Amino acid sequence: MKDTIVLYPNIGRGHLVSMVELGKLILTHHPSLSITILILTPSTTPSTTTFACDSNAQYIATVTATIPAITFHHVPLATLPSNTPSLPPHLVSLELARHSTQNVAVAFQTLAKASNLKAIIIDLLNFNDPKTLTQNLNKNIHTYFYYTSGASTLALLLHYPTIHETLTKNYVKDQPLQIQIPGLRANITTDDFAKDSKDPSNYSSQAFLKIAETMRGSFGIIINTFEAIEEELIRALSEDGTVPPLFCIGPVISAPYGEDDKGCLSWLDSQPSQSVVLLCFGSMGSFSRTQLKEIAVGLEKSEQRFLWVVRAELDCADSVDEQPSLDELMPGGFLERTKEKGLVVRDWAPQVQILSHDSVGGFVTHCGWNSVLEAVCEGVPMAAWPLYAEQRVNRVIMVEDMKVALAVNEDKAGFVSATELGDRVRELMESDKGKEIRQRTFKMKISAAEAMAEGGTSRVALDKLAKLWKES
């Protein structure tokens, strides 16, 4: 019976993909281990439709067919109480995991009886107290947290009790507070926090307090980053006597998946080297009709070649089955006027393959950490347009600390003007500042490859983890 590591991802698509890639990474270098991924299987209730259950199911089926060493264990996803407040998607996923605690605990017991269970790795958004989840398991089965974003936002999270205390004493609406924690050089204020986490009394703030407390009590924290990209912050966290051991094993990025049924790659084949800017905003990055039209105007003004993945908000449609056409979403004549320079596709495109294509020279991103790492690993400079969760903080880190991006600035309502987008795209692709960012990103591409190579910092961290598991 093989030693088994159980991975418990959040149901959000980016979190699931990152956890699967972690499992693949473990198996690549330590094939004597077995990987089981626990999957909360959602219903089609309104509270879960945000997470594109069908696409997750298709992705899981692909992994099952191509990597038999990874097995999936499905667990019923609890439904949310009718009095659950309206929450943003990442907090809905947190609540769904919290209400599924008992089902997950039973699943862990079942897996422990059927395998030689060595460790459990839990996504940070499934932050239920590990003692509750593992109370009936052998005490030698250690629990780790997997943090799918970078060390900078992890530091903010682990220091959140102190930040919360400061907010409680000094919080005034619309008056930002400077955030200072060891190792953080970037100029971050409470304005960079997600809207739902600025008020110290609301649900989000209380959840972050609980997450910080729970993560500090774990056996270790596995981070999807590498030392060269966030060196000072990683050192500061490692030297903090109250933080569990850190294992920086990244960059863990998605392997190419899905068919290019929209012809993105063949279109790129016909474009000049490094001439195309990709606009793609993640699985939950959707926009209103007004914002979509503004993006279109901005792209046309920029006079740059572009590949744009469009995802419209649900209220843009008359019904779920009757989505508006691209012509209806765009300004009149836009698709015809830009057909020689641009390609617009709906909902999804093979982002990893696109970023690796020689024709791509820039990336307008929502600042999700998976996307940031994918761009870094291909040496593609970015324009940072955050949408939700920790992404505004990521923007500051990308621009000021990592220096791999330009900031796309929005108004107080979160709206980005055509002029702002057009100027940033042109600056990224044509200016001396854009060239500097491209050179910096290319250096980080080399550092990322070195970290993952034999003897590299991330490879050493993974080997250390595997040794701990095998000896437990």
Curated annotation (Swiss-Prot):
It comes from the Eukaryota. It is an enzyme of class 2 (transferase). Keywords: Glycosyltransferase, Transferase. UDP-alpha-D-glucose binds at residues 283, 348-349, 366-374, 388-391. One of its GO terms (molecular function) is UDP-glucosyltransferase activity. Belongs to the UDP-glycosyltransferase family. This is UDP-glycosyltransferase 2. Glycosyltransferase that possesses isoflavonoids 4'-O- and 7-O-glucosyltransferase activities. Shows a successive glucosylation toward the acceptors producing their corresponding 4',7-O-diglucosides. Can use genistein, formononetin, daidzein, liquiritigenin and naringenin as substrates. Also shows a 3'-O-glucosylation activity in vitro. The keyword Glycosyltransferase applies. The keyword Transferase applies. It comes from Pueraria montana var. lobata. It holds the Pfam family UDPGT. Highly expressed in roots. Expressed in leaves and stems. SUPFAM superfamilies: UDP-Glycosyltransferase/glycogen phosphorylase (SSF53756). PANTHER family: GLYCOSYLTRANSFERASE, ISOFLAVONE 7-O-GLUCOSYLTRANSFERASE 1. Its EC number is 2.4.1.-.
